[in-house]
From Swiss-Prot:
InterPro entries: Class_I_gatase-like, HST_MetA, MetA_family
Keywords: Acyltransferase, Amino-acid biosynthesis, Cytoplasm, Methionine biosynthesis, Transferase
Location(s), subcellular: Cytoplasm
Protein's organism: Vibrio parahaemolyticus serotype O3:K6 (strain RIMD 2210633)
Record site feature (Important for substrate specificity), residues: 192
Domain of life per record: Bacteria
Stated name of the protein: Homoserine O-succinyltransferase
Gene of this entry: metAS
Length: 313
């Protein structure tokens, strides 16, 4: 089944050229099944690029998904046209009275900024608290995973000395967990972060199910027992050239970034990178939608409550 997004959203044309089924709002209205309602809080600077990446992954499901885009505040963006934000993005005041099946909170380039120094930190905390009573399952990606762990477990910010950048091997730890169904025993996924997610630290200070780790990158995937909070510390949504663009950006800013690990053929930035994580990203989002959202959410979102959730895997 397709995703349902506004006809004029730039991602619509991009996804259609990739032969991805995008349903118009008119056609979707004639469907007799209840579509899933997913809200994306986009914290990345290049919002059009990021929304397209996440919509691509959400589209690979037999479930119909209605997507709404949320911005953190109304400050002008340096990287996204104001017209785009005004047309396609909601303010929190416009959605806080609704319930959603799923919420995705994207990463943000704030790895070296303390939480209390993030200009929208208080607003982000408000949204995360709101999600506890209005969202079936929340997916926290990269920096948002660190922010979510701070809110839910009061974990201090842990920062690596050097930025983690590249594509890393990961191992799964519970092949029978629903979100890991169909995963290979080892898989590749990209990371681009300063945040440190030590398996030992999370095991000691949380009750999370730690589902996938990397010897180098640490914890990659973890969930709460009820699957209502899912933490992904990498960037499975990244396009093949996203790490490259970040590397070139950092070079242009006079930094001395390390070449992203296991990314360029022969470790040579002159060679076009190969996306070795694409199938993993699609399977991860498919499983999240199916097992953490669809099979957990109440049929009637107007009667959202803890008691409405199924406890079966």
């Amino acid at each position: 089944m397709p995703i349902r997004i506004p006809d004029q959203l730039p991602a619509s044309d991009v996804l259609r050229t990739e032969n991805i089924f995008v349903m118009s709002e008119t056609r979707a209205a004639s469907q007799e099944i209840r579509p899933l309602r997913v809200l994306i809080l986009n914290l990345m600077p290049k919002k059009i690029e990021t929304e397209t990446q996440f919509l691509r992954l959400l589209s690979n499901s037999p479930l119909q998904v209605n997507v709404e885009l949320l911005r953190i505040d109304n400050r002008p963006s340096k990287n996204t046209p104001t017209e785009h934000l005004d047309t396609f993005y909601r303010q929190f005041e416009m959605v806080k009275g609704k319930n959603f099946d799923g919420l995705i909170i994207t990463g943000a380039p704030l790895g070296l900024v303390q939480f209390e120094d993030v200009i929208y930190w208080d607003h982000l905390k408000t949204i995360m608290e709101w999600a506890k009573d209005h969202v079936t399952s929340t997916l926290y990606v990269c920096w948002a995973a660190q922010a979510g762990l701070k809110l839910l477990y009061d974990l201090p910010k842990k920062t690596r000395k050097e930025k983690l950048s590249g594509v890393y091997h990961h191992q799964i730890h519970n092949p029978f967990h629903p979100i890991l169904r169909g995963f290979d025993d080892t898989f590749l996924a990209p990371h681009s972060r300063y945040a440190d997610f030590s398996p030992h630290f999370l095991e000691e200070h949380t009750d999370l199910d730690i589902l996938a780790t990397s010897d180098v990158a640490g914890v990659y995937l973890a969930t709460t027992k009820d699957k209502r909070n899912v933490f992904v510390t990498g960037h499975p949504e990244y396009d093949s050239h996203t790490l490259h663009n970040e590397y070139i950006r950092d070079l242009g800013e006079g930094m001395e970034p390390a070449i992203p690990v296991n990314y360029y053929p022969n470790n040579n930035p002159d060679n076009p990178p190969i996306a070795s994580w694409r199938s993993h990203g699609h399977l991860l989002f498919l499983n999240w939608l199916n097992y953490c959202v669809y099979q957990q959410t109440p049929y009637d979102l107007d009667h959202f409550s803890e008691d409405a959730f199924t406890k079966d895997d």
